[in-house]
Swiss-Prot record:
Gene name of this polypeptide: HGO
Species: Arabidopsis thaliana
Keyword Membrane in annotation: no
Name this protein carries in UniProt: Homogentisate 1,2-dioxygenase
GO-annotated molecular function: homogentisate 1,2-dioxygenase activity; metal ion binding
Pathway: Amino-acid degradation; L-phenylalanine degradation; acetoacetate and fumarate from L-phenylalanine: step 4/6
Amino acid sequence: MEEKKKELEELKYQSGFGNHFSSEAIAGALPLDQNSPLLCPYGLYAEQISGTSFTSPRKLNQRSWLYRVKPSVTHEPFKPRVPAHKKLVSEFDASNSRTNPTQLRWRPEDIPDSEIDFVDGLFTICGAGSSFLRHGFAIHMYVANTGMKDSAFCNADGDFLLVPQTGRLWIETECGRLLVTPGEIAVIPQGFRFSIDLPDGKSRGYVAEIYGAHFQLPDLGPIGANGLAASRDFLAPTAWFEDGLRPEYTIVQKFGGELFTAKQDFSPFNVVAWHGNYVPYKYDLKKFCPYNTVLLDHGDPSINTVLTAPTDKPGVALLDFVIFPPRWLVAEHTFRPPYYHRNCMSEFMGLIYGAYEAKADGFLPGGASLHSCMTPHGPDTTTYEATIARVNAMAPSKLTGTMAFMFESALIPRVCHWALESPFLDHDYYQCWIGLKSHFSRISLDKTNVESTEKEPGASE
């Protein structure tokens, strides 16, 4: 335990997003002047991992070179995992999911007392598209209470974006190690092998998975050169490796939504040095620099985008990761909570800690909601009535102690059968809007509005 604590304290990272990094656990382990020499330093094997096709445009091309004690190919044949994992989906159809336009909300999933690791505790909520066709996404959740023992997970289907809500994640990857706390996120790109330990025991969180794309920083447009998530705040691991025999070590590979296992006699985390721009990374959401309206109206949630996975259509995302962090609310003559909305995009929301400004109760940390394409949603009755009651006392206020987030996609998700049959599904969610009453009156127009309509266009005071 003391050794693990020391490792946590001494962990070092490299800063930047999309950088070409280089890292050595032993000085001189990286070859000079070429990627694949006849003999690598220290007798290592050279192995490339490609995150894009070889002929992808240079500005989009992602790959890394790993210099390892033994190559990844040294394993027994893959076999279907027994017992099969029946709650992971990457091909969404009527056999495993169904469409549902109703507003959906789930209470936090209980973390079981019986031993369960990240792989067995991972289950799909909803998604669209297909990992086979390299287009789509899946949203999962996980509950776990023990680390992965003598095993590593590899997702051949797509990239994972991990959002821990309870409990830290100690993630060992082929590029090094990451410690990810609630309030931080981690991205594990397609194909990387990783193992998750749980320093705090019980753990719960959310996972977004994308097929056929990678996350990137959103364009800032008129915001300028700075703001939102800064490149310098993304952290990649530094090289670290394990050597020696590990009999019966298991690689668990997710392939087409199914799990397969292969045995080998060494740890996959035997990379002594590496270089490239295809790497796992983490980000602290507290470092996000939010923007907001400073005079009137409520800004669109896109101003809080941390990462985006684009489609071929400009401005349309396969998946956006958006947060709702602490911030000042100062807009005048404005309904400050999120507005009522019907969206051509589908919105899955989660809550890491605190409370969400549009829901007075019922939306809990570790819970989730789904508002699909063109399904109406917005503040609950309590929030609306409390807000309009303060019409004459709208001083600037600060949202504190909260961190909600949203996965937003242009694709329409199908919801897994078990998610719709879950005991944690809130069947009374719709009740939070039933109390919204009509305030319409032909004679109670606001005096300010009356005066403004009586003025001539362009007239001064």
